[in-house]
Every structure is written in C-alpha cells, then in structure tokens.
Amino acid sequence: MRIRIAARGSKLSRIQVMMVENYLHKLGIETEFIEIKTKADLFQNEPLSKLGKGVFEKEVNQAVLDNKADVAVHSMKDILTEISENLEIYAVLPRDPPFDILISRKNLFNLEPNSIIGTSSIRRKNFLTFYRNDLNIKDLRGNIDTRLKKYFEGQYDGIIIAEASIYRLKEQVQYYRLDPHLFTPEANQGIIVVIGRKKDETIKKIFNEINDKDTLEIAIAERKALSIVGGGCHSPIGVYFEKYDKDFHGIISSSFGRKKITIEEYFHNMTPYEAGELLGKRFLEEIKNEGIIP
C-alpha cells in the first residue's frame, strides 16, 4: 500500500513529513510526497496578518479533498480550530518542545534599548511590547533558514521563533527559552498533525496506530480553550496545556497594550474538552472583569 502525503515544500515541512513517513515505513507502508505551493510561500514579504487565517493549511488540505493526496501533514498550530466538514484529524505525533525562543546573544531583559527584534506573530509582538516597549520590533517572514540568515547577517539583534523548528532542523544556535507564563505559546505549537478525509476508514485505521493519545488530548484542550475565547477576544491568545496522568495543567494569556491577563489552572478528573472549556471561560470572565471586553 502507498499513502500520498501532501505538505508545503519548505525544509521544515519536508522534515515533518519524513517524521510521519518513518512511522508508516515501520508498519510496512510505502509513501509518496506531494509538494503544495501555498499563498504563504508565494508572498513571503507580506505580513502574515494580511494573508488571512489558515494561510498555511487551506491549499494543502484542498489537495486531500481533491484526492490528489491521501493525507495532509501540518504543524498543528497552523490549523484553524474549525477545519472542513469533510476532513478530520487522523493522528498527532508526540509533542516536540512547545515553547517560544529568543535567538540572541542576550536574554530578553538584558537586550539594549532599541534592539531590533524580528517576528511575524502578533501574539509575540504583543508580549514583547508589554515586557520591553523600548525594543524595535520588525516583521520577519520566510522559512527558518531565511530567518536565521537574516539574523546572522546582523539585520536583527534577535528573532523569536518556535523552539520546535530549531529542534527538528537540528540547528546549533544560541537561544533563550521563553517561560510559558511570560510568553504563553500558540495553541498546539510543537505538534505535528495528520489530516485526512472523514470517509476513508482504511487509511484512518492505519494512522490510528501511530497516534499519540496524550498529545492529542493536550491538543484538544488547547483548541477548545481557544475556540471558547476566539469569538469574544480580538487579541491573539497563547494557550498551553500539560497532562499528568489524568490531570491537566493549563495556562492561557494575552497582552492588551499595557495590560496582560494570564490565567493558570489545574484540572482534576476532567476530559480535555472540559478542561479547555473551563480555562477559556475563566479567561473570558477575567477580561470582562478588567473591562477589556463588554
């Protein structure tokens, strides 16, 4: 049997596909890589906020819907909380480091005033501005190799990216991991997800064998919290869950100009849906109490 895997053509995306392929090859399944060019790849000078939601996923998923591929592989943080009704999550791999990192010669609080810091994430920009409003924050697009090249050329004094990308690429660079209480990661950061057609039970059954159930429960909790908050808050949210046996620990945070709201909770004997929903509702209640939303 051969499974066709659709993904973007970047080096990082290709490595993520290879990680999935390694699991399939151990099961005796052959694979074929289907490269998809997305709008995000074609317009790398445009800020992500201008390209719209789902910019990394829609065209890749469409290849699955059009039967040009059997499954799509993504970084799960790029997947909208609601995907096509004809698609579903088949599997996730064990989570890689979920944190944000600052690649720089100095840590965040030792950077000189007016240091140039690169990021294309509004969430990261908002956290940066809250802690260090004396920094010069500039957009930074392109694949990880491009971003690192710009940093080493001296165009930036530091750049903020996901630790998982450095981990997967095996890049040897000096960096500082950002505490999730201060820089709460994007929901599902560090998780590789496989998406397929709902009615394709044969392929779905294969991926059920490689699915990491604990990581999936964490992903569900984070996505549920994000979906609860999403309709009531226009500022990008960080959501991070950990699982200990049957218990969950969750952090949800966002920065609103000079004010930053963070909620941290422990949840006992709850499903991931229940834990995520409760954390999201408590965050909404807090930002209402603070007058951030009506």
From Swiss-Prot:
Pathway in which the depicted protein is active: Porphyrin-containing compound metabolism; protoporphyrin-IX biosynthesis; coproporphyrinogen-III from 5-aminolevulinate: step 2/4
UniProt modified residues of type S-(dipyrrolylmethanemethyl)cysteine: 233
**What organism does the record attribute this protein to?**
Sulfurisphaera tokodaii (strain DSM 16993 / JCM 10545 / NBRC 100140 / 7)
Q: What does this protein do?
A: Tetrapolymerization of the monopyrrole PBG into the hydroxymethylbilane pre-uroporphyrinogen in several discrete steps.
Q: What is this protein called?
A: Probable porphobilinogen deaminase
Query: Mind telling me which NCBIfam families this protein's record contains?
Result: hemC
List the InterPro entries hit by this protein, alphabetically.
Answer: HemC (IPR000860), Porphobilin_deaminase_cofac_BS (IPR022419), Porphobilin_deaminase_N (IPR022417), Porphobilinogen_deaminase_C (IPR022418), Porphobilinogen_deaminase_C_sf (IPR036803)
* A Pfam family the protein falls into: Porphobil_deam
Q: Where do transmembrane segments lie in this chain?
A: none
As its record notes, the protein acts as a catalyst of:
4 porphobilinogen + H2O = hydroxymethylbilane + 4 NH4(+)
Q: Which GO BP terms apply?
A: protoporphyrinogen IX biosynthetic process
Note the SUPFAM superfamilies from the entry. Periplasmic binding protein-like II, Porphobilinogen deaminase (hydroxymethylbilane synthase), C-terminal domain
